[in-house]
């Protein structure tokens, strides 16, 4: 699992194509919309939560095997904004 490093300002994500998608009950969310088709279902992009967790936008679709997220966040890895847990 990947997370943003401590102290990273979420607004920096705009530089990498992420858009603020609102504050839901669980905090601010930033989304980079890209088509990620797995078993005929579109995961709709990469979502970063206020506490730094990085996941696919729809991480709980049943009966599919999720791909490794690493290839989809290479820009953040190269910019040294994330850590692997």
Positions of PLM-derived features:
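Short active-site oxyanion
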Residues: 1
């Amino acid at each position: 699992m990947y997370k943003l490093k401590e102290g990273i300002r979420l607004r920096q994500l705009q530089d990498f194509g992420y858009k603020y998608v609102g504050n839901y009950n669980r905090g601010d969310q930033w989304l980079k919309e890209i088509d990620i088709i797995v078993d005929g279902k579109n995961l709709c992009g990469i979502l970063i939560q206020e506490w730094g967790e990085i996941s696919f936008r729809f991480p709980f679709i049943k009966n599919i095997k999720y791909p490794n997220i690493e290839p989809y966040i290479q820009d953040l890895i190269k910019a040294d904004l994330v850590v692997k847990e």
